[in-house]
Amino acid sequence: MNVTFDGIYNEIIENMHHFASEEKDFSKLTQYKDLISKTIDEVVEEVFNDIFSYEKTKTLFDESKRKELEEDFKNWIKGLFEISNDSDLNEFYKEIVKRGIKYVEKDFLPEYLTAIIIKIEDRLKNKLKEELKEDAQEIVDILDDLLKRVILLNVAAYMNFESKVLDYIGINQNLKKNAVKLGIKKMGL
């Protein structure tokens, strides 16, 4: 397979910079590290309890694998709020793309990550507004920008990698489109 991580990463970052606005100063979030960390722990635990209450996920993950994934996820998401310069940001973007690809292997779908991040964002916005009152809007905007980028990069990495792997094994775009069309027809949509 002639696909490299750097190739996938560069393609995704180029697209993100083309479609997204300029990054905000994410380092301002480090001032609220304790509040953010506590909120992340609470939300990730709640969401993992929800996700792992379904039979499908119970069959994919045993309890130890679930705890390992949960702790890894908490630690990683907290890293979002330790970005202090462009170099940190670039490394963090690479980590998001790597995780987007690795989660393909773990059956941890992008929609799980998206659900967790949206819930974290909602909870953090409320807590920041309680703590900062009228000064909260700038920080909430920065938080919103950062988390949207995480979701965008994660989904793009998952889809880009999956597409390249399927192309490599001979399942091209036309075959994928025809399979989707057949699925839509079978569902009567």
UniProtKB/Swiss-Prot annotation:
Coiled coil: none annotated. To M.jannaschii MJ1461. It comes from Methanocaldococcus jannaschii (strain ATCC 43067 / DSM 2661 / JAL-1 / JCM 10045 / NBRC 100440). This is Uncharacterized protein MJ1356. InterPro entries: Globin-sensor_dom (IPR044398), Globin/Proto (IPR012292). It comes from the Archaea. GO terms for molecular function: heme binding; oxygen binding.
